[in-house]
Structures are given as C-alpha cells and as structure tokens.
C-alpha cells in the first residue's frame, strides 16, 4: 500500500509568492489499484507524483510505502520500486543509445552490471519477445538509435522499460499528452494491459477525461491541493465525462473564471 499522510507542501516559502499547495493532505492507495487523477493546472496532480517519487520533498507529513516512511530515500533509491513514464517521450530513454542498450540498462536497473550482459543471445531473444506484442515493429529494430523512433514508439519503449524489473508502483505523468490521438489510444491500450498483466499499483495523471473514465478502478479530481472527487469500484465505473465537466464548471464559477 502507498500512503500519503498529512502532507504539507509550501512553494517559495518566506516570499511574496509563497503558496501552500498541500495542507494536511492524505491519500491511501491499496496494492493493485489503478488510480486516474484529473484536475486543472496547478491543482497538485504533478506535485503529488513528484512527492511520491522524491523529485521534491514535503514540508510535513509522511509518505509510506508498504508501511515504511520513504521520505529520506533519494529519488534514485525510490526508482528501484517506482517506475515512471513522463509526458515527454524523450524522457525515460537515452536517445543516443540503441533500443538494445536502453533495454539492457533497464533490465539491470539497480544491479552492478555492464552493458555486455545485455548482449547475451538469450537476452536479445527475450527482448524481441517482449517487444513483439507492442505491434510497433521494435523487435526488428534493436540496433536502431532510440532518437530515430517516433514519439509513440519511444513512449511504448519507455513504458516497457519502466516495468521490466519488479516494481511496486507505476507512475504515469500525462504520458499520452504529447502523442497524436491514434498513437495515444495505442499507448493507453498497452498501459492497461501492462498494469493488468503485471498486477501493478498505478497512478495516472491525465487531462484526457475519456481515459480517466475508461481506465482504472478509481478516479480522483484534484483542486488546489484537495481531492474534490474520489470514486472507486462501482462508483467509479458509473462516472461519466459529463459528470467531470460539471464539477470542473462548478469549480471554475467558484474561482470567478
């Protein structure tokens, strides 16, 4: 289980631009749950992910992974148990290295191993079999530089790499936002399959309300550091895009927009 307990986060403390984003914010995510997170810009979505991954530190509260407080763990240490796929397809992979080299690095993440271990014939065959179900032809492009791939191919590779080693949590940070609609649908189908087959606990931040409704078994809507909507199970399955738009409009009116 992942628990964010009584978190407080202040940006630009002691300045005229000081902003308290989270004040006593708590969230518990059981093992195996796939959570979709929506909300307007500045609502706290990405900050929540950054707090979990260790990119930023809280000013109070706890972040517990399987009951252990991980606040003192570096971002690098947390990455052993947390896979993250970013909005930018260029992140999460190395453009100047080949697909094979990227897969090798991901395969031995956290282990004292060099690239030569990834060139073993059995590993190469295994990589091809991992890539084949993607349906993007990557299994025949192992020697190609990642920088030559399309955005969709690169994002699919990043998703695969982030889940190659045993992880506890998968963080999806608007990972389809930079893709065209058709490619985004392909990546979302792949995402759903990977989460389901590997039985991962996943948190997906998205601006695509259709994806938020169609994927996952829990939905959160964030606003100014608070969860203004939290539905799981059958209640989540009953949520429609129109329901989300209604809440967005109500919030907009309250804020004077």
Language-model features: locations:
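Conserved ABC transporter NBD signature motif
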Residues: 61-69, 231
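Helix-to-loop junction immediately C-terminal to a conserved catalytic motif
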Residues: 53
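Conserved beta-strand-loop-alpha-helix hinge in the C-terminal portion
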Residues: 226-250
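Walker B catalytic motif
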Residues: 174-175
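ABC ATPase NBD coupling module
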Residues: 69-83, 113-116, 120, 236-242
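A short, flexible loop at the N-terminus of ABC-type nucleotide-binding domains that lies
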Residues: 1, 10-24, 74
């Amino acid at each position: 289980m992942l628990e964010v307990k009584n978190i407080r986060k202040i940006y630009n403390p002691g300045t005229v631009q000081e902003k308290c984003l989270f004040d006593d914010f708590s969230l518990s995510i059981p093992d195996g749950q796939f959570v979709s997170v929506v909300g307007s810009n500045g609502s706290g979505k990405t900050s929540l992910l950054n707090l979990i991954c260790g990119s930023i530190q809280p000013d109070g509260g706890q972040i517990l992974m399987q009951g252990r407080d991980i606040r003192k763990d570096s971002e690098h240490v947390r990455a052993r148990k947390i896979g993250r796929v970013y909005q930018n397809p260029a992140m999460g992979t190395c453009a100047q290295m080949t697909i094979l080299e990227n897969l090798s690095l991901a395969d031995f993440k956290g282990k004292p191993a060099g690239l030569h271990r990834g060139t073993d014939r059995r590993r190469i065959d295994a990589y091809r079999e991992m890539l084949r179900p993607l349906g993007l032809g990557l299994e025949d492009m192992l020697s190609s530089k990642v920088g030559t791939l399309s955005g969709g191919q690169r994002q699919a590779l990043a998703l695969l790499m982030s889940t190659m080693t045993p992880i506890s949590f998968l963080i999806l940070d608007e990972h389809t936002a930079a893709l065209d609609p058709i490619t985004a649908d392909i990546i979302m189908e792949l995402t759903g399959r990977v989460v389901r087959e590997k039985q991962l606990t996943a948190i997906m931040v998205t601006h695509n309300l259709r994806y938020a409704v169609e994927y996952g078994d829990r939905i959160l809507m964030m606003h100014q550091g608070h969860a203004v909507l939290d539905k799981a199970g059958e209640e989540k399955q009953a949520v429609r895009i129109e329901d989300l738009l209604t809440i967005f409009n109500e919030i907009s009116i309250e804020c004077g927009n």
